[in-house]
Amino acid sequence: MDPCSVGVQLRTTHDCHKTFYTRHTGFKTLKELSSNDMLLLQLRTGMTLSGNNTICLHHVKIYIERFEELQKSCCDPFNIHKKLAKKNLHVIDLDDATFLSAKFGRQLVPGWKLCPKCTQIINGSVDVDSDDRQRRKPESDGRTAKALRSLQFTNPGKQTEFAPESGKREKRKLTKNASASSDRQIIPAKSKVYDSQGLLIFSGMDLCDCLDEDCLGCFYACPTCGSTKCGAECRCDRKWLYEQIEIEGGEIIHNKHAGKAYGLLSPCHPYDILQK
């Protein structure tokens, strides 16, 4: 079955028609979506879309129906987290995304989440009480129409444009110190861990750099391949993998597949790792 327009534009055609979240396969044209779903799709993908474009049922689940559920950590709009914050998260709705994006001059996407600390910063920086927030919320239809009109002259672009110098890739980037040698290993220059599609060569798995096997992508879109599964560096033809990562709260997540690749890996000096 051919890939959908969304998969082609995002360069994630290998994900089209997966049955992880739906038992059915097939397409929808974007004109079949409601105006609100069409708007959310544009904001969440950063794509310029038309009614004749198609979206497979898998991508409908990922970007529309289950997008909020799949956001597992704070989007960290102020670049304050050294590790991923995953507790007590608050969902950014369409109204808040529009309001806060205009207030702070950076693109916040409906469905992203904020931790209590970032929420406190917003509440402290934006002098708006609950009544004001209610007054600024127009009727649902008017809200959608206004946001759709704004897309006629501006588009948020790819999610990487939200914070090119930071983003989740930087949050998950391993600290450049002596401990880095235990966090990842480097393969010799002529060997690769990942193929040209970003899949693990020894297993064919499309493993996110967060090391969660069920994750469908939790990073900002990679500027090289467009995947949301690439961490600090694009996975395509990459010559190293993460052996473990540390998340907010000090929890260590180990790569269950590192052992399978152990025969491919060779020891390296920590200096080589720091040069990455």
From Swiss-Prot:
Subunit structure: Interacts with ARL14 and MYO1E.
Region (Disordered): 159-183
Underlying gene: Arl14ep
Subcellular location: Cytoplasm
Principal location class: cytoplasm
Any one of the GO CC terms: focal adhesion
Name under which the protein is recorded: ARL14 effector protein
Residue numbers bearing the Phosphoserine modification: 182, 266
Top-level division of the source organism's lineage: Eukaryota
Residues in cross-link Glycyl lysine isopeptide (Lys-Gly) (interchain with G-Cter in SUMO2): 176
InterPro entries: ARF7EP_C
Swiss-Prot/TrEMBL keywords: Cytoplasm, Isopeptide bond, Phosphoprotein, Ubl conjugation
Role: Through its interaction with ARL14 and MYO1E, may connect MHC class II-containing cytoplasmic vesicles to the actin network and hence controls the movement of these vesicles along the actin cytoskeleton in dendritic cells.
